[in-house]
Amino acid sequence: METLFNKKLTVGGRDQESTGFAWWAGNARLINVSGKLLGAHVAHAGLIVFWTGAMNLFEVAHFVPQKPMYEQGLILLPHLATLGFGVGFDGIVLDTYPFFVCGVLHLISSAVLGFGGVFHSLAGPDTLEESFRFFGYTWKRKKKLAAILGIHLCFLGLGALLLAWKAMYGGGVYDTWWPGGGDVRSITNPTLNPFIIFGYLVKSPFGGEGWIVSVDSMEYVIGGHIWIGILLVSGGFWHICSRPSPWVVRTFVWSGEAYLSYSLGAVATMGFIAVPMVWFNNTVYPSEFYGPTGPEASQAQAFTFLIRDQRLGTNIASAQGPTGLGKYLMKSPTGEIIFGGETMRFWDFRGPWLEPLRGPNGLDLNKLKNDVQPWQERRAAEYMTHAPLGSLNSVGGVATEINAVNFVNPRSWLATSHFVLAFFFFVGHLWHAGRARAAAIGFEKGIDRSREIARKLKPLD
């Protein structure tokens, strides 16, 4: 029997003495064998794509068309529906076949990637430099690594432009702001004004500003993807064709572990940005598929009770709550008419079911009394009872105890999982960045294990 303390333990034909890393260090054992590292890279991509395809088909098999997606614990089908596949007016699923096709295509792709990963891990050359010079690299070849970065940027840019093409020419995307309840439509006139697109980056993240999370137009979303796609492709060609400047060479650490830390930091940043986006934004993440946001559920409850009590004869304009403030309507810090009660904290909420009832100074009292449509009432009642909040009493004025059993709003799951994973990626970034910098400076000593008692233990057998 081999034990954890046996340095000669061989996994995948590599041991601690030949690689400098123990078996549990994973791909660190492949740091100097580019061919095998490519195999691990491709196999990892295959696993990701396999999960995507398998989970996609799992969700299709369990999907019930009569129920909203957000009631069924789905996280992949809402993304496909947002892209305009299989859905129509009001987010109604018309055909699940596009979902099925997407899952099968991912499974086929994962098989190709899996074969490539196994081939390069077991049968391919140890290093690419000898057999495939174009694909070969070493960690110190700065020009080559800059070109690899450029290739990655080009592919990311093409992905962003592909979304723009789908929205403009490939059948359109789902727009929750379409009058009367949302629909799939082609974005024929995306906004390309740089002051509008990049203005989101300098907006405050607080209150009614909301940084990039406040985007509420598909024209802005697609226009932003066009800008990002062009910038990424342009930057990719720049890095492919140019050499790193001297100040770049001096600033960055050039080693495999340093590149790993940069990548982990980038993924962590994207994960942290995704958290408020999926939690607050109902344009990119339509509530028809992902369920209401927290503020949306709270505002929906206030709206539902306002409509109910108004029909019972209440004067919604003058009724006061127990604090003396307006029970149904009140003034916001900026002077707008907003919903009263505990939902006042969400006064800056914007949603497609509520915006038709606004006027030049917030909610329009005349519209609330005379123009409320049945679809708005139904949607508000539905969102009120599906808040992304788990509580035994109430949060933000939303009574959630009725839904606390056997219901998790997809926004809760997606926001929490992205935050937790982004945090771990960020910790990994700090860890590997510290190790890479220490190694570059030359004072990385590691832990002194010469006196560890484990070194004196005999194998168990």
From Swiss-Prot:
Binds multiple chlorophylls and provides some of the ligands for the Ca-4Mn-5O cluster of the oxygen-evolving complex. It may also provide a ligand for a Cl- that is required for oxygen evolution. PSII binds additional chlorophylls, carotenoids and specific lipids. It is a multi-pass membrane protein. Coiled coil: none annotated. GO terms for molecular function: chlorophyll binding; electron transporter, transferring electrons within the cyclic electron transport pathway of photosynthesis activity; metal ion binding. GO terms for cellular component: chloroplast thylakoid membrane; photosystem II. It is found in: Plastid, Chloroplast thylakoid membrane. InterPro entries: PS_antenna-like (IPR000932), PS_II_antenna-like_sf (IPR036001), PSII_PsbC (IPR005869), PSII_PsbC_sf (IPR044900). GO terms for biological process: photosynthetic electron transport in photosystem II. The keyword Membrane applies. Residues 1-2 form a propeptide. The keyword Transferase does not apply. The modification N-acetylthreonine is found at residue 3. One of the components of the core complex of photosystem II (PSII). It binds chlorophyll and helps catalyze the primary light-induced photochemical processes of PSII. PSII is a light-driven water:plastoquinone oxidoreductase, using light energy to abstract electrons from H(2)O, generating O(2) and a proton gradient subsequently used for ATP formation. HAMAP family: PSII_PsbC_CP43. Belongs to the PsbB/PsbC family. PsbC subfamily. PSII is composed of 1 copy each of membrane proteins PsbA, PsbB, PsbC, PsbD, PsbE, PsbF, PsbH, PsbI, PsbJ, PsbK, PsbL, PsbM, PsbT, PsbY, PsbZ, Psb30/Ycf12, at least 3 peripheral proteins of the oxygen-evolving complex and a large number of cofactors. It forms dimeric complexes. This is Photosystem II CP43 reaction center protein. It comes from Euglena gracilis.
